Regions:
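Active-site-adjacent scaffolding segments
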Residues: 1-121
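Structured surface interface patches that mediate subunit assembly and partner/cofactor docking
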Residues: 2-11, 33-38, 42, 65-68, ...
């Protein structure tokens, strides 16, 4: 089967770039945005979403992978950092950056790309919450879209190939299959909304009812 995945070194590079630009962006946000609600995340604020963003690499480094991707696993990340300020969280993320960057090239495929896909999803979620549009053409978006293509190539849905072959931007493909587009938005970008809805129903995400522009 053809693989659509980005090369491991590109995946690792994309995560390092994502981490650095997200840290830089968040160091400058107004104090009243720290506890702003992040749309279509599990009732998380900006700060709590960052808890998850650093919690995933923390758990990887600690070998704490039991229940990986489940709500229990992700909520534990938020809980253990519940008393940390945003500045403290960003410092932690920065401090483990070099270590996780060296480890990512050793992640098996496609897990390495899925790791970037998740982080990229939440970077864009935060951007939407704080009104900081950007990084739509970032390397991490290419990596994320390629992970989606690889996922679709191996999917059992009889019309998954239709989504795979659709002419759509990397950003819209990544956000649509990441559960960050309403069905109307999915249709508007040229994808079959019924097929996307059925595929997303089998993923740990869901189709939003209110439009998300990032």
């Amino acid at each position: 089967m053809t693989t659509y995945l980005s090369p491991p070194d590109v995946v690792a590079q994309s995560y390092g770039e994502l981490r650095r630009r997200t840290i830089d962006m968040l160091r400058d946000i107004p104090a009243d945005m720290v506890e702003a609600q992040v749309p279509h995340c599990p009732s998380w604020t900006v700060r709590e979403t960052v808890c998850h963003l650093i919690g995933v690499p923390e758990d990887v480094l600690a070998g704490n992978m039991e229940g990986v991707t489940t709500e229990t696993w992700t909520q534990a990340q938020v809980h253990r950092h519940k008393s940390d300020s945003l500045e403290e969280l960003l410092n932690i993320w920065e401090s483990i950056g070099d270590t996780i960057d060296l480890l990512i090239p050793q992640f098996p495929e496609p897990i390495n790309s899925q790791f970037v896909f998740d982080a990229n999803a939440h970077e864009q979620d935060i951007r939407y919450a704080i009104g900081s549009r950007g990084a739509r053409d970032a390397l991490s978006v290419t990596v994320s879209a390629n992970w989606v293509r690889n996922f679709l190539a191996g999917h059992s849905h009889p019309q998954a190939k239709e989504i795979l072959q659709a002419e759509v931007s990397d950003f819209d493909l990544f956000r649509s299959l990441g559960g960050r587009r309403t069905l109307a938005q999915v249709r508007a970008c040229g994808l079959n909304d019924n097929v996307v809805n059925e595929i997303v129903a089998g993923m740990p995400v869901s189709i939003p009812t209110q439009e998300i522009s990032e």
